[in-house]
């Protein structure tokens, strides 16, 4: 499920931020976390980023396919493309007047 990799990633972010801030102070951690990119096994390219403008996690592996109840469990897996996701997000924000 999503919560397991998301929580593991959150711990990785906090660990890296504490190292960079040399502190566990919440305000210092928040400053370091903003825009931070870390190495992560769940990243599409081996990294994930805490986007600076809205603190959204981006760059994680995403994909889809047909699920089945036996191995390989997912047929015709297609990897998501973050370039396309960012383009669609920008179009949506513009259509809603957010940009």
Predicted regions and their residues:
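Extracytosolic ligand-binding ectodomains
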Residues: 1-99
